[in-house]
Design a protein with these regions (language model features):
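Electropositive nucleic-acid engagement tracts
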Residues: 5-21, 29-97, 103-104, 201, ...
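Short, conserved catalytic/metal-binding motifs centered on acidic residues
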Residues: 41, 81-95, 122, 213-221, ...
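Electropositive, glycine- and tryptophan-enriched low-complexity nucleic-acid-binding patches
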Residues: 52-56, 109-211, 303-325
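Active-site-proximal, Lys/Arg-enriched surface segment
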Residues: 58-159, 291, 295-297
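Short amphipathic alpha-helical "interface-anchor" segments enriched in bulky aromatics
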Residues: 91, 267, 334-365
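An internal, acidic/charged active-site-proximal segment
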Residues: 162-310, 397-403, 445-446, 451
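Basic, amphipathic alpha-helical segments enriched in Lys/Arg and hydrophobic/aromatic residues
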Residues: 362-417
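Long, low-complexity C-terminal extensions of enzymes
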Residues: 405-453
Length: 453
């Protein structure tokens, strides 16, 4: 399937010139080697893909959310499949001072804050295919107030111990203070971004399929995000709590006649979880796995939580480790909750491919519009590569992005060589020669041309 054919449905949001430019750029990206920058692309583009053309394309305002949605709905959506929305933030390292939105963001790869750009992404995961398709990407740009909160400047010298001196006075809740409504939250730019992007995505996908859950990593495992997901998006959250979270079992004893009904029972001891909550136990290679599920309470959350605790024990050393997952959907079975949270990691493969193959880490643009277009183009190529790979993986499951790029690159070399032949060469013969070209530099050396229809 030709790339221009895949992009033909974008006429709803792009003009004909932009579609042609995008097709030339996309074909160069899937063919080229080296860094995916504007200059690098211009060295691999065919006729109509000069550096100035690429530069003009990068300075256009393009609705990437609509572009990604049209590609997904036309080529990747499968009626009848179950879908899950997942979200995560990715950080790309950048140097200098001029790039739009540059700041210090925490990178899980480096394990510390690094200088760079951050982008929040929402994708749709097919539960049947177990693949993630990014549909919305937005840059995280901190205001001056946010930056001051994240990294405040010290205003006074602290003691040698590094802790401020405590002032004398009564400890505890001030007299006369009222209980706060946990369903009323303090909105932050991060919560506004999640609400805005979530509503935009649901408006597009709801007519096609029913979405019930939004899976997020442990950074979003708090009451504020849960209330946004429940109240604004009308979805159920699936996320992770800290492994030392103070969880309480629901009180099951007799209620006293005076005062508010007692809600909190015994505090959960992760080393001695009651066996009546155990729903699964297995042993493999001296590792015992126990899974517990119960409806529990957390004092910072407004509503009860469906909590799943996975405990792994090394039978020789008796060392233990546990993970605490939760959902606001109290009817969700433990197998489904665990599986949906595992599917959240599919978005990490989108980030990996975008950085490794499609220029998410390589772009050198500094202004807002070119930066947005470079990132949108990278995630568009992630979705286009899914479509192109599906053509070969039906027969050759191990066919990878590297094999795809090797195949396109080999055909490009063949095209340049065939231009040296006389003009009377049969076009049908040229097409057959291109199909028979071996993928030079491919990871898998099987003859790819035997897979072509």
């Amino acid at each position: 399937m030709d790339i221009i054919t895949l992009l033909s449905g974008l006429s709803q949001c792009l003009d004909e010139t932009s579609i042609k430019q995008l097709a030339v750029i996309a074909k160069a990206m899937v063919t080229m080697s080296g860094q995916v920058t504007m200059l690098g692309m211009s060295r691999w583009t065919e006729r109509g893909g000069s550096y100035r053309t690429i530069q003009r394309f990068y300075n256009k305002v393009i609705p990437w959310g609509v572009v990604l949605w049209l590609v997904f709905s036309k080529h990747l959506y499968r009626p009848g499949d179950e879908y899950l929305v997942v979200g995560d933030e990715s950080v790309v390292s950048k140097a200098g001072q001029e790039t739009y939105g540059i700041d210090r963001f925490f990178s899980s790869i480096f394990g510390k804050p690094v200088r760079g750009l951050a982008f929040f992404t929402l994708s749709v995961v097919s539960v049947n295919e177990r693949k993630s398709y990014p549909l919305l990407v937005e840059q995280v740009v901190r205001s001056a107030q946010e930056a001051a909160v994240v990294s405040p400047k010290p205003t006074a010298k602290q003691s040698k111990a590094g802790k401020p001196k405590q002032t004398s006075g009564k400890v505890g809740r001030p007299k006369g203070s009222k209980a706060k409504d946990k369903r009323t939250i303090e909105w932050t730019p991060e919560l506004r971004r999640l609400e805005r992007m979530g509503k935009s995505l649901l408006e597009r996908i709801t007519p096609l399929c029913l979405i019930r859950h939004l899976a997020l990593d442990g950074h979003f495992g708090n009451n504020n995000v849960t209330q946004v997901v429940r109240q604004s998006l009308n979805l159920h959250i699936i996320s992770k709590l800290r492994n030392d979270s103070a969880l309480y079992l629901c009180y099951e004893g007799a209620q006293h006649g005076v005062g508010a009904p007692k809600r909190y029972g015994a505090k959960l001891d992760y080393d001695q979880i009651p066996t009546k909550y155990r729903v699964h136990a297995s042993t493999e290679k001296q590792i015992q796995t126990e899974i517990y599920q119960a409806t529990m309470l957390h004092k910072t959350f407004a509503d009860p939580l469906n909590v799943v605790v996975m405990v792994k024990t090394h039978l020789v050393t008796q060392k233990k480790a546990h993970v605490v997952l939760f959902s606001s959907d109290l009817t969700l079975a433990y197998e489904k909750l665990i599986d949906d949270y595992r599917l959240r990691f599919q978005i990490e493969f989108n980030f990996r491919d975008a950085k490794q193959f499609w220029g998410f880490e390589d772009f050198m643009n500094v202004n807002k519009t070119p930066v947005t277009n470079a990132v949108g183009l990278a995630f568009l190529m992630v979705n286009l590569s899914h479509i192109l790979l599906a053509r070969y993986r039906t027969t050759f499951p191990d066919f990878s992005v590297l094999d795809l790029k090797a195949l396109f690159r080999s055909r490009r070399y063949a095209q340049e060589a065939l231009k040296l032949l006389p003009d009377f060469v049969d076009p049908l013969l040229i097409a057959q020669l291109l199909d028979a070209m071996p993928p030079l530099g491919a990871i898998h050396s099987e003859p790819i041309f035997t897979l072509n229809p």
